[in-house]
Each structure stands twice: as C-alpha cells, then as structure tokens.
Amino acid sequence: MKFNIPIFLTIFRVILIPFFVIAFYLPIESSPFITTLIFFIAGVTDWLDGYLARKWKQTTRFGAFLDPVADKVMVVAALVLIVEHQHTFWITIPAIIMISREIIISALREWMAELGERSKIAVSWWGKWKTTAQMLALGGLLWRYNNYMEIAAIILLYIAAILTIWSMIQYLQVAKGSLLDNIQL
C-alpha cells in the first residue's frame, strides 16, 4: 500500500483511542480537558482525512474501511466512558440507542455491500447532523467544565439520539427493497 496522508491521519486516530481512554482515568484535575482535547483532535483528523482524500484523489478501499471503524470505536469508547462516569439512566438510554444504531447500520452497510448495493446507503445529511450533535454532546460531557455545559451537552445528546433514530429509519427505508428481496425464511 502506498503511503498517503489521509490514511496516516486515520491510523493516527486509531492510535489516539487508548490514549483517550487513559487520559479519562488520569488522577489529575485536568483529565477531563485532556480527554476532550484528544477527542477534538480525533474529530478534526476525521474531517481532515476525508477532505484530503477527496481533494487529492487518494481514496482507497483500506481508508474507506478503516475510517468508519476508527470513528465508531472512538464514539463508542466515549459513550462507554461517559455512561460509566455519569452512572445515570438519562445518559445510558441515549448511549444505548447510539451504539445500537452504529451496529445496525454497520451491519446494513456490510449486507448491502454483499448485494453490490453499498452506494444506496451512502452517508446522508441526517447522518451528518447526527454526527455534529453527537460530537458536541460527547465533547461537553467529557469536559464537564461546568453545570451549564453539562446541561447543554445532555440536551445535545438527546437531539443526537433523536437524529440517530431518524437517520437509521432513513437508511433502513432506502435499503428496505433490497432487504425484502433477499430475505429467505
């Protein structure tokens, strides 16, 4: 595989994940800030690797595989850490919704790829809005700077959960015909 910067950025994001988890558990006052900073850097590299891959025409199958995996592992890690820290039903429910959606849509994309119809379920604007709300919510809940930030982050978490459900419904509707045509009971 030929080296390219977008792939390097994606691999860098994967490498950040254990440091992200370690930073969360550091027994120092600045741990929430450091954790959020790592999460923010991962988010920037996620945007940048896709932008550069398209701009420089360096998209690869490996990048197309690894990029969403890195994203999902980082988001799931953040959700698990936040649920553990908050230890409340009100955070756990949207986290379960988001993690479930990621698993379902990943499986759906794999299924559609098997059928040769992967392009039918490309990322939608609903998915992009969901991701934006989700990242802002997770960043706020990781940082925990003050009560106002936490309240705003929880509101964004619920907005993200609603968009999560909505975007999943949209993806399933697009794939419904292909799914029904290929179900064998």
Curated annotation (Swiss-Prot):
It comes from Haemophilus influenzae (strain ATCC 51907 / DSM 11121 / KW20 / Rd). GO terms for molecular function: CDP-diacylglycerol-glycerol-3-phosphate 3-phosphatidyltransferase activity. This is CDP-diacylglycerol--glycerol-3-phosphate 3-phosphatidyltransferase. It comes from the Bacteria. GO terms for cellular component: plasma membrane. Belongs to the CDP-alcohol phosphatidyltransferase class-I family. It is a multi-pass membrane protein. GO terms for biological process: glycerophospholipid biosynthetic process; phosphatidylglycerol biosynthetic process. Pathway: Phospholipid metabolism; phosphatidylglycerol biosynthesis; phosphatidylglycerol from CDP-diacylglycerol: step 1/2.
